From Swiss-Prot:
Class in the EC hierarchy, top level: transferase
The protein's name: Type III pantothenate kinase
Gene3D superfamilies in UniProt: 3.30.420.40
Source organism of the structure: Listeria innocua serovar 6a (strain ATCC BAA-680 / CLIP 11262)
A biological process from GO: coenzyme A biosynthetic process
Cellular localisation: Cytoplasm
NCBIfam families: baf, PRK13318.1-1, PRK13318.1-5, PRK13318.1-6, PRK13321.1
Pfam families: Pan_kinase
Entry annotation: catalytic residues: D109
Amino acids binding K(+): D129
Residues annotated as binding substrate: G107, S108, D109, R110, T184
CDD domains registered for this protein in UniProt: ASKHA_NBD_PanK-III
Length: 259
């Protein structure tokens, strides 16, 4: 079995794969102040609930966009699983040709998503990840990662509206059936919801126009379902795209990582 860990700015997603099949997955809050023991106890609790043990795991791979948590995360893997994890970063074999100004600055989550989408759905492909930031990645028909766009995520934008507009309340992110709100809260929720649908559709349309292609559009991330259910711009919703990419990258780099 393989343990895959996706460390995002808001949440960490943990999954267990066996023979390329996702058996279990869990989510925990990303806290850069957690110790390796706290991380270990959390993961072991997940395992206990699923009747798994650390000895079931033969390899671990981690993607992280939060550098401060990585020392504790790597220490946890060694201490509780006796495995030195494979880290997605420079030197890892991805199979992608990165045609960007500085490949090292691309977030590992974007690389993982691009690998998974290209393998699973073919190219050209646009990957939209609705996370703390909303990212759009374009991989051309030759499988070349051409770059993309990064926009503030829906949660960041919602919180900024509350923090910077004195008379506006904090609101929950919710699907709105009416674009014309009858109250301040309803108006904010409508603006946030339909605004992000418009952002998503506009960026995708412009990417298609500038690339002069008709790529398949794949969405992932915690808030993807709510947005994509109302948008015709997205072809495929894949909530486990990042975990799939991690498992695939582990197999591509397996000879040097498995215990």
């Amino acid at each position: 079995m393989i343990l895959v860990i996706d460390v995002g700015n808001t949440n960490c997603t943990v999954g267990v794969y066996k023979e390329q099949k996702l058996l279990r997955h869990w989510r925990m809050t990303t806290d850069r102040h957690r110790t390796s023991d706290e991380l270990g106890m959390t993961v072991l609790n997940f395992f206990s609930y699923a009747n798994l043990t650390p000895s079931d795991i033969q390899g671990i791979i981690i993607s992280s966009v939060v550098p401060p948590i990585m020392h504790a995360m790597e220490t946890m893997c060694v201490r509780y699983f006796n495995i030195r994890p494979l880290i997605v970063g420079p030197g890892i074999k991805t199979g992608l040709n990165l045609k960007v100004d500085n490949p090292r600055e691309i977030g590992s989550d974007r690389i993982v998503n691009a690998v998974a989408a290209s393998e699973e759905y073919g190219t050209p492909v646009i990957v939209v990840d609705f996370g703390t930031a909303t990212t759009f990645c374009y991989i051309d028909e030759a499988g070349v990662y051409q770059g993309g766009a990064i926009a503030p995520g829906i949660m960041i934008s919602t919180e900024a509206l509350y923090n910077r507009a004195a008379k506006l309340p904090r609101v929950d992110i919710a699907e709105s059936s009416q674009i014309i709100g009858k109250s301040t809260v309803a108006s904010m929720q409508a603006g946030i919801f339909y605004g992000f649908i418009g952002q998503c559709e506009g960026i995708i349309a412009e990417m298609k126009k500038q690339s002069n292609t008709s790529p398949v559009v794949v969405a992932t991330g915690g808030l993807a379902r709510m947005i994509t259910e109302k948008s015709s711009a997205v072809d495929i919703l894949d909530p486990f795209l990042t975990l799939k990419g991690l498992e695939l990258l582990y197999r591509r780099n397996k000879p040097t990582t498995e215990k």
